[in-house]
Design a protein with these regions (language model features):
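A conserved mid-protein helix/loop that constitutes part of the nucleotide-sugar donor-binding site
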Residues: 129-137, 289-303
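Short hydrophobic beta-strand element within catalytic cores of glycosyltransferases
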Residues: 152, 380-383
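Glycosyltransferase donor-sugar binding loop
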Residues: 152-157, 285, 313-325, 341
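Nucleotide-activated donor-binding/catalytic signature segment of Leloir-type glycosyltransferases, i.e.
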Residues: 326-343
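Short alpha-helical donor nucleotide-sugar binding micro-motif in glycosyltransferases
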Residues: 342-343, 350-355
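Conserved acidic donor-binding segment of nucleotide-sugar-dependent glycosyltransferases
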Residues: 395-396, 400-407, 416-421
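A short, well-ordered alpha-helix in the C-terminal region of glycosyltransferases
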Residues: 409, 416, 423-438, 450
Length: 457
């Protein structure tokens, strides 16, 4: 077998351990700066220089491969000659493993030692993003119900430690083999599969033919995602939406498909609430990038009169992803604002125990976990009308809602809370009822029982 590898970046570096370089003719890359260089003993060529008639397959090791497919088609390469990175297992010997209780097992060993009914949960990465954490919590509920859950993701990350602590088995990186025969055979042993985001649509398209029930739990509520990641119509694919806003966006694009609303479960892991000191703490928590609207929060804080900011700490918590605010400038010009950075879940629980008010001004946020966590702690929340929990909030009774990107309205809500600290405890207790009614373990068990009934029909 002779193979040309298209791509020399991150996906090649992750794949190279499995690739037999004696079968590789050359690399192809669109970056002119790499042309002519040698990589692992093979020359890097431009697409026009490579002789694709001299190979059996072209293996595309690029994440967004659609433009590469079009490019290869224009060069006369037939589609059946092209393999994508999830097909690596079809060309080379890939030995995926499952991590369980500190040990590694191949698919056959793991399945043989698990007599329980098995459910696989798939997300895009095993990091502390909302969807991955939510799926981990579902895995915990499935264990309570007698299932053997198995977490998997395209990429691994910092969630691995928590999976180990919770005794949840996982496959750390399926992006190199989810299109291959081994994975297809293994999927067939599952009772059903839960896929946690629209962004890994390609995985669903690859596994749906196996006829195992696929529960596609979509959490996105913007038109671009529904345009970029097409859904499919199959009898074994069941659609669920993580809130009212997701349902509305789903039906806008797919009015002919059935979809049911299913909210996530959040474990009640509250730590003891700290004694309040003289400082009134207002926090915004989440990845720092435009969708989370930290810029709106900062601008609202800047417009609050100075005399209202006495003994107030405005705190930004989260990992900096994209420039939405100039953090150094913000901190220098606004001493009442603090940047705390990213927190583990354990640290975040401790943080919530001392927080007085949460602000979530997101431009688009179907059902942010941090808002539910605040409600769990009985912390009053100010959210934009583009935040999913807003559908359960009665303004001024169990929280506060303002029009998205309306800096003046957010400023007024914050000032109201500063001026009426004496009623915030009651509002927080009312917000706790939202958590109990919609996000508890009992609610999730009922959801999973309904899924069981639906997929067995």
């Amino acid at each position: 077998m002779k193979v040309i590898l298209f791509g020399t970046g991150n996906y090649y570096r992750q794949s190279k351990a499995y690739i037999d370089m004696t079968q590789v003719i050359c690399f192809v890359d669109n970056d002119p700066k790499k042309t002519g260089a040698m990589l692992d003993g093979k020359k890097i060529m431009t697409p026009k220089e490579a002789d694709f008639t001299n190979c059996d397959y072209v293996l595309v090791l690029v994440m967004r491969y659609q433009s590469i497919l079009e490019q290869l088609s224009a060069l006369g390469v037939s589609r059946d000659k092209i393999k994508l990175y999830p097909d690596l297992d079809d060309l080379f010997e890939v030995k995926p493993c499952i991590c369980s209780e500190g040990k590694q097992y191949d698919f056959t060993q793991w399945a043989a030692n698990r007599p329980e009914k098995k459910v696989m949960l798939i997300c895009h990465e095993l990091t502390r993003n909302g969807v991955s954490v939510v799926l981990m919590h579902v895995a915990q509920v499935l264990k309570r119900m007698g299932y053997c859950p198995l977490m998997s993701a395209l990429l691994e990350g910092e969630l691995l430690e928590e999976l180990q602590e919770n005794h949840i088995d996982y496959i750390p990186q399926i992006h190199l083999f989810y299109g291959g025969r081994q994975f297809a055979d293994f999927i067939g042993k599952m009772e059903f599969i839960i896929v946690g985001t629209i962004g890994i649509a390609d995985v669903v398209w690859r596994i749906a033919h196996i006829e195992v029930p696929v529960v596609w739990w979509i959490h996105e509520s913007n038109d671009k995602d529904f345009h970029d990641f097409p859904l499919l119509v199959r009898n074994n694919v069941y659609y669920y939406a993580g809130g009212k806003r997701v349902v509305e966006c789903f039906k806008k694009h797919y009015p002919y498909l059935s979809v049911e609303k299913m909210l996530y479960y959040l474990p009640d892991n509250r730590v003891e609430t700290k004694c309040r000191d003289a400082i009134f703490r207002i926090g915004i928590i989440g990845l720092i990038y435009p969708r989370k609207a930290q810029d709106i929060f900062v601008e609202a804080v800047k417009k609050i009169p100075a005399e209202k900011k006495n003994a107030i700490s405005f705190e930004i918590v989260g990992k900096y992803i994209e420039p939405v605010i100039d953090m150094d400038k913000v901190l220098k010009e606004n001493p009442e604002i603090q940047y705390i950075g990213e927190m583990s879940q354990r640290a975040l629980n401790d943080y919530f125990a001392g927080l007085d008010l949460l602000v979530c001004p997101s431009r688009d946020d179907p059902m942010p976990v941090v808002v539910t966590q605040a409600m769990q702690y009985g912390i009053p929340c100010i959210v934009s009308d583009q935040v999913g929990q807003s559908e359960y909030i009665i303004d001024g009774k169990n929280g506060f809602v303002f029009p998205t990107e309306n800096i003046k309205a957010l400023k007024e809500k914050i000032i109201y809370c500063i001026d009426h600290k004496d009623i915030l405890s009651d509002i927080g207790q009312e917000s706790r009822k939202i958590y109990e009614n919609y996000f508890s373990v009992e609610a999730m068990e009922e959801n999973l029982l309904r899924i069981e009934d639906r997929v067995r029909r």
